[in-house]
Amino acid sequence: MWQEIWNTVLSEFSVPDAQQITRITLRLVVAAALGGVLGYEREQKGKSAGVRTHMLVAMGAALFVLIPQQAGASSEDLSRVLQGLIAGVGFLGAGAIIMGTKQVEIRGLTTAAGIWVTAAIGMAAGMGRESTTALSTLIALLVLSVVPWIFRTKKVTMSDAQE
């Protein structure tokens, strides 16, 4: 009986081959690293969601994609997982939004959007789309760091930009 229990425990931790463990590790590390890049930018600007938050969001999103793939779920099932993940991360991002004392003052929208994009990057990493994750991270980083610089340089107010 004890041998049967031990064999069951061992089978739960077994990985069929080195390729699979390498693939899983690579996807999780890529997700965490690229999420960390966006989190670093937010943290340097003193925003509430920084490196750790973005890394965990990206890695969590990658895990939510990897688990159904490993379980052999259909593409329809994976689609439902992605839909739930997108909605759930939207709820998480809502926590980053703060309403100021003035009714027109809302803070944290960019950080919330950054969390949402970070989750999408994690989903892409979990699906093995490393080039998509790298390009998306680069574009998001440009949006977060270069676009505000352009507005400051051109002395364009946000109300002018929205017209």
Predicted segments — roles?
Residues 1-81, 127-128, 133, 149-153, ...:
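Alpha-helical transmembrane segments and their membrane-interface boundaries
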Residues 48-53, 100-110:
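Short, amphipathic, aromatic/basic-enriched membrane-interface segments that mark the entry/exit
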Residues 54-66, 88-90, 112-125:
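Small-residue-rich segments of transmembrane alpha-helices in multi-pass membrane proteins
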Residues 76-92:
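Alpha-helical transmembrane-segment detector that highlights a single hydrophobic TM helix
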Residues 89-93, 139-149:
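Alpha-helical transmembrane segments and their membrane-interface exit regions
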Residues 103-104, 119-133:
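Membrane-helix boundary connector in multi-pass membrane proteins
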